[in-house]
Structure formats: structure tokens, C-alpha cells
Amino acid sequence: MANLLKTVVTGCSCPFLSNLGSCKVLPGKKNFLRAFHTHRILWCKAPVKPGIPYKQLTVGVPKEIFQNEKRVALSPAGVQALVKQGFNVVVESGAGEASKFSDDHYRAAGAQIQGAKEVLASDLVVKVRAPMLNPTLGIHEADLLKTSGTLISFIYPAQNPDLLNKLSKRNTTVLAMDQVPRVTIAQGYDALSSMANIAGYKAVVLAANHFGRFFTGQITAAGKVPPAKILIVGGGVAGLASAGAAKSMGAIVRGFDTRAAALEQFKSLGAEPLEVDLKESGEGQGGYAKEMSKEFIEAEMKLFAQQCKEVDILISTALIPGKKAPILFNKEMIESMKEGSVVVDLAAEAGGNFETTKPGELYVHKGITHIGYTDLPSRMATQASTLYSNNITKLLKAISPDKDNFYFEVKDDFDFGTMGHVIRGTVVMKDGQVIFPAPTPKNIPQGAPVKQKTVAELEAEKAATITPFRKTMTSASVYTAGLTGILGLGIAAPNLAFSQMVTTFGLAGIVGYHTVWGVTPALHSPLMSVTNAISGLTAVGGLVLMGGHLYPSTTSQGLAALATFISSVNIAGGFLVTQRMLDMFKRPTDPPEYNYLYLLPAGTFVGGYLASLYSGYNIEQIMYLGSGLCCVGALAGLSTQGTARLGNALGMIGVAGGLAATLGGLKPCPELLAQMSGAMALGGTIGLTIAKRIQISDLPQLVAAFHSLVGLAAVLTCIAEYIIEYPHFATDAAANLTKIVAYLGTYIGGVTFSGSLVAYGKLQGILKSAPLLLPGRHLLNAGLLAASVGGIIPFMMDPSFTTGITCLGSVSALSAVMGVTLTAAIGGADMPVVITVLNSYSGWALCAEGFLLNNNLLTIVGALIGSSGAILSYIMCVAMNRSLANVILGGYGTTSTAGGKPMEISGTHTEINLDNAIDMIREANSIIITPGYGLCAAKAQYPIADLVKMLSEQGKKVRFGIHPVAGRMPGQLNVLLAEAGVPYDIVLEMDEINHDFPDTDLVLVIGANDTVNSAAQEDPNSIIAGMPVLEVWKSKQVIVMKRSLGVGYAAVDNPIFYKPNTAMLLGDAKKTCDALQAKVRESYQK
């Protein structure tokens, strides 16, 4: 049956059977139906391909007849490509001779050699120049084209309407090579760019040939030869080709264009981009520049006039599609050039950019050589023909990708950047109908957004607006205010003792300023700890005011005893914690130390004083001087690791000498001395116990707690001093000064006390670390400040004791509340600044005690601590690019934040597992680890230290990069790493290591976010804009170890998570570090 059916089908002449395909015959599936379903086959038709088979088409390559035209449309290689595709190719005899392609080359490639008429009658004719009158044949080339044939050539349809009319009469389909859209997909067929590239290169070669000097500068025995200066106008393909060629020949190259992108390309080639002062975008359509405004052109002319007097060679390429080339250089400009200069006008064919250009000619005008050739590509005919041939063959394959038939479809509905766009833009005539210009494509991409200026650029612009006068005036105003204040203090001084105390305070502040700046950042934590211990000299104030016998007998004496007790906690605990931290920085290779020998100067200092006291000498002031100098030495000793332990020893000596001199000056009775000793001994024992048990990771909260003790001691001392001195106020000339200092010291101490307690609660986890933003908190704080300041009025005006003690009690309460509201509004990540500010407050409170008691030691030490805390606060704020007021008032945003909409982050992140991370670590030779607070919170320093040790033993260069505000107090991460045994010489600060990231194979970011956030540099609208950060993204590979992709404290998305060189290793930091350590150890043991 099947054979019968095939016979019927084969012999049937019925039309619906004529295209019968060889489909499979399908039998029925039910047993009782034994028929075949033949109707499916009877109606099946094979698809018919559109177009004409390549083997039926002939491509003709005529000889170019335009004057001096040496190019040919197809090279032998191009012919070979078309023959391989299936085309028949005929070439006019001698068509390629001027391009060094002989007829034999074409024959070898598979072409036939024929006459002009036969070639032009081909189905598809490819040319360089548009058809023109053939003088030899006496007929126009368009009239020799085959009816309904196809022409591919440069046409310039807007300038040649008569030619289009001739071609229309022949029903020709025309593809204009000059109309190929300048889109990414069409770069391989962009003949204009190919020819412009050659023209740009040739322009430099011709200029060098007619210029009388070297392009490159030389210093020879015969003398110095300056380099040639070249200005290139127009940053298109030709201009950039000229810039590259001229730069490679050693010339000084300058480039000008109205388009910002073109100027960037000039810069990338090593040329100096020139701009006018007027900002206006020159971006036009199709990759060309647009016509500019009158104001811009005037500024442009001014720039060109100036450049003409400086440069040796001018090359101009400026064109506007479909219009005459603009005149950019007038006659006066050209004549202002140095004799022997050269100008090359690549726009000569369109009229030229120079007023003095003669298109197609080379001539000299008043000593200036003018090159106005219109056939520069033709002067490199072989290269130009090869590139043009490649453009045509690629275009033919692209528009007709079918392997068998030549066919392309012209559509008026097409998307931007597609082949439909290329075909519709290139075809200017279809079957004799002019369809030029092409309609606007759909989905036209928006122009590139204006490049957002970086934070550094905006800062530079901002700095540039500050004139030298304004800068100097600001500086002069500061000095004027300072000197005026000093004069005011002198006038207000009640006695000589006050003036001497101000002198001591000023000099101590200057010494402290210069001393603290010398402290290495790695030792900022020990610095704060030692200043905390030294601030315990508030005990001196307590000792001076203590009284009674074995027990205090009055309220003031009780307050003084309590101040002495809590100050002693600070002294003992502070020095022991400092010693513990410094011992952690010791390396196994360090030489042995014999610090116990510093007992010798300590014994000499204190013992010598006791001996002199026993001998009847009163040298307390000299002892205070010696103690103060030792405290200065304590801070100075922390400038290096080698002298840090000496600094701690000097601090102990200074405090011990100060306490001894105080006791010696007081000469207490045995009972009172026992009371004093008991208070200090009990406080010291408690301080030592706390310091011995505290974990180093809990150091920030310990420092905060100790600061609260200093603040409380200052409040107690000031109130006690007021109570004791009150009976003498009526006869004391300095009574008002004493009252002012007592009031001020109480206020500072109250803020320090409560603020430190809140900071302790946040750091210890008792309170939430998130900022507590009370409604109207700024008004509340302003009210508290006004009430505190206003309270001094009745305090000074009313001489009664009740009013005075009430005012002191009120300011104590108000300042304590203000300390709470201020500190509660500050988030946990800003605690480094809070602690340093509180450290500074404690110093100023100590200064207030010094003025109150007329004690030089307290004034000197207070100035040291106050300046130390102030400088550390400044360092922290600079590290965040924020003002101190912004941090203290619980604000957000840096001083560089522009205030606009933040940059949107797009893209996807890459996640890896432990095995991937191990592979990356093993392959890297240079590794930088950048830890953040997450390392502290997870206590992952020990596995990281072990990992670093293993990697170092394998010969890898491993270092740490520490941000100044990483952690919860200055230098905390340095101490934690030292605790784990990491050598301090591989732990570098941000400024020391930032320049090394580009040469680093791998960066491990552990628990850090804001401190490595690239938005600080990339987004001027980010609230962390301008904040100095560790530039980890500049390394070759980055592994970020975090719990999640969540934001950091600043609540800013981090762009580095989505950068192509970043991999996210998500999970708990401690567990991940332990696993990394174990895996690395396992991999190296195999």
C-alpha cells in the first residue's frame, strides 16, 4: 500500500501534490481501523528559501576613474572570500594596479578579468567612489549598471541628488558605505572609520615630511633640539589616529574636542586634552559632534588663537554630517604661527577647517605649509583597499547570513543597534525608490549620563574657591582671637598666681600637643590607658581636701575621701592595663628587657624628696615639676614600640612623685595619713583586681568606666572645695575665680561621669548600641546647656551658701542628664570618638582642679590629657571625614556629602565556599588582611594569627591594614592582634598600606564594611563621601567575610560586594576563620 501511494504521488501532476515531502507514513493506532492517514502527507509543503542562489550572482569590481584615485573596492583576499561564499566575481582589467594588486592576483583568487562595460553590468557592483561620467567610454557609469541591479559604494546621498535620480531610473538598489550606522554591531563594516584611521596616520607622516625639525626632543653634543608641539582638533577616528602616531614619534600632543568622551580618549593616548572655560556638551548623533553655541565658539576661537602662537603643527578633522566643514582657524590665526609650521586639513574635501586651505593642494602661505589633500587614504592605496575590501565582505556576509541564497530585507521598523538598523541605514535606494534618510530606530539608548565627579574632584573644586586672601584672613582672625583672649585673661586675672597658672597651662598644652602627635597610631590604645591612669591624679585634689582623723568628720571631707578612693582605682588599674597591652607587643626576637631597673630613678626621686622633707626643705613645687615632666615623658615614650614600656614606667614615677609631694606638703597627722593611705590602698587594690581580670577585648568599656570615675572625682572635689573655701570668699580677692572654676569643673565632671557610664553600657551590651534619637533632642540639649550656663548667674550674684550649693547641685544634675542625652544619641560605631572626647573632658576637669587648688601638677597633667584626647578626637573625625560636632550631636553624613540622591548599585555578587577561598589563598603570593569590628566581636584574632603564621612560613607576604576607626577605641585592633601574637611590624595603618593594594594578589576583609566602602570615593552623594577608606577593591582579588550582605553602621550599601573581583564568603567570622585555619593547615600538610 505504501509503495502504491508513493507511485501515485510521484506520478501525480495535481498542484497540491507537486511539493510532496518525504514525511513518514503514520498507521492507525486502533486495531479495528486498518486505514492509513495519508492526508497529512498530501498537504505538507517544503519551505521555499527567499533570495537568489549565490552561484547565480556576479559581483563586479570596476576600475576607479576618479582623478588620482588609486584604491580598488575588493582586494584579492576579498575576492577569494566572496568566491568561497559562492559568488561569481569579475574584475575590470587593471582595477587593482594602483593598489599593487595585479590581474594575476585576482585570477589566482578566483575572479575573471573583463572590460568596464561587462563589469558594470554585473548583478552586484562594488565601488569606492560614487558612479561618475566615464570619459573613455563617454557614458555615465550609472547608465551602464544592470537594471534592477545592486550597487555598493560611497554615495553621500544628501550631496548627490542628481546621482540618485540616475540610479533610480535603473531601478537600482544602493547600499551607501558612508551611511553605515555607527553602532557597535557595525564596527566591522564602518568604512568611514577605516579610511579616517588611514587619513589620520598619513596626516602625521606628511606633516613630519614637510616639518623642518625632529618630532622628538633631543639633547646632542651639537645642542638641544626641542620637541615639536602638535595640536589636533577633533577626537574622532582620524584625530585619535593622528594623536597616537604623533605621540609615538615623540611630539608633544594636544587635543581638542567638544565632546567629553573624546577628550578622555585623547588623554588615554598621552595627549594633553584642551578645554574652554565655558561648559557645554558637544555630543551629537551618529558619533559626530554637534554645532555649538555662539558663546562657546567665541571661547573656542580664543583658545585656538592662543594655541596657534605656541604649536608647530596643526591637524584639524572637524566635520558636520551633510554640511560644509566649519572654519575653525581664520587667516590671522594661521599667520600668527611660527614660520616653518605645518597645517594639515583633513576636512579639506568638505571645504576645510582653515580659512587658508586650498582643497586638494599643497602650498606655502607666508611660511606656513598647507596640506589640503582630499585623497589621503588613496595615498596609502594598498592598505586602504585592503581595509575597504574587508568592510564590504563583512557587510555582505552580515546582511545575508544564509549559506545558499543572497537575500536581505529592508524594514522601516527596527530596533537600535540591530542588523535591521544596519541594513535600513545603509540602503539608501530600494529598487529605484529613494528611501534616504532612514527613519528613527526604536529603543534609542539615552545619551551617556554626565560623568559624576568624584569626591576628590569636588573637594579640589571646593578648595580652589578659597582665595589666598580668604585663607590668610581666616588664619589672621584665628591668631587675633587667640591673642585677644590672652589679653582678656591678663586683665581679668585677680592675682599673680592666676597669671602664673595660665602660663603653666598654656605651655603644658603646647607640649602636650606636640608630644601626642608623635605617638604611633598602633599605640593609641596604650596612650589612652596611660592618660587614664595619669588622670587619676584627681586623687591629689582629694588628698588636699581630706580631713578628720581615721574617718572624715564633715561632708566635704567625706566627699574628698571618696574622690581619693575612686581616683586610686584609676591609677592602679590604668597602669596595669597599659603594662599588659605593651607586653603583648613584644616579639620573640626582641632583646630582653630589664624594666625593673627603673625602680632606681623612682626610688631616687621619691626617696630623695622624703629625705629633703625630713631635712626641712620644702621642694613640693619642684617635685610637681619633676612629676609633670615624667608624665610628659610617659606620653612621649609611646611614640615608638621600643620606648613604650619606658613611657609607662615614667608615668608611674610621675604619679608616685606627685602623690608623695602632696602628702609631704600636707604633713598630715598619723590618723589622717592612715585614712589617706587606706582610701588609696583600697582603691588601688580594686583597680589592680579589675585590670588583672579584664579581657583585652573589653578594654574600651574599661576605659569608659575609668573615665566616669575621673568625672565623678572632679565633681566631688569641686563641691568639696566650694564647701571648704566658702567661709573665706568674703575676704578672698580670688573668690569669684574660685567659684567660676568650681562651677566649670563640676559641669565638665558631670558630663564626663554620665557620658562615660552610657558609653560603658553601650560597649558592654547593657544598652543598645544603636543611637537613641529622642524627639527634639537638639532642643533638649540646647535647653540643658542654657540652663547650665544660666545657673552661674545666681551662683555668682548671690553670696549665700544655700544658693551656691544649690547651683552646684543643679549643674551637676543638668550636666549628668546632658551627658546621657548626648552619648545615648551616638551609635556604637562612633564610640572611638566618644571615648577620646571623654578622655579630653577628663583632662580639662583635672585642669579645673588645678586652677581651683592652685596646683601646678594638676594643671600640667590636665593640659596633657586634655590635648591628648582632643588630638585623638581630631584624628578619628578626620578618619571619618566628619566634624566633631556631627559626631557628638549624633549626626550622619560627612563634610563632603553633596546631599543629592545616592548612587544606585546594580549587579550581582559572587559567593564562594571555603574550598574556593582556600584555592585563592594558596594561589596568592601577596595578601593583605583588613579586619573590622566584626573581628573583635567574634574574637577571631587567634585563628587569624595562626593562619598568618602558616602563610608566612610558606613564603607568602602577609600584612594587616588597619583603619583608624576600626574597633571601638583607637588602636583596639592593634592590641587584639598583638594579644594573638601577630608581630606589630606587619600591622600597618591605612596611610601606610593604601598604595600597596594595586600590587596585592588577595585581600581578606574580615568583619569590616564602612571602612572599605568604595562609595566614599565614588559617590559624592553618599553620607560617607570623602571618608578615607582602605582601597581594597584596587587589589586583584577580594574575599569579604561577613554574616550577610547587610549594610554597616552608616547604613550605606557597599559597591565592592558587587565588583567583579570580589567574592563573598558569608558566615560567622569566628567559625569561618577557624575553618580557614584548619583547611589551610590540612592543605599544607598533604
Swiss-Prot record:
A GO term for molecular function: identical protein binding
Taxonomy, superkingdom: Eukaryota
Catalysed conversion reaction: NAD(+) + NADPH + H(+)(in) = NADH + NADP(+) + H(+)(out)
Gene3D superfamilies membership: NAD(P)-binding Rossmann-like Domain (3.40.50.720), TPP-binding domain (3.40.50.1220)
Binding-site residues, NADP(+): 933, 965-970, 1007-1011, 1026-1027, 1042-1049, 1068-1069
Transit peptide: 1-43
E.C. number(s) listed in UniProt: 7.1.1.1
Entries under SMART domains matching the protein: AlaDh_PNT_C, AlaDh_PNT_N
GO cellular component terms, A-Z: mitochondrial inner membrane
SUPFAM superfamilies registered for this protein in UniProt: DHS-like NAD/FAD-binding domain, Formate/glycerate dehydrogenase catalytic domain-like, NAD(P)-binding Rossmann-fold domains
Complex and partners: Homodimer.
Protein name (Swiss-Prot/TrEMBL): NAD(P) transhydrogenase, mitochondrial
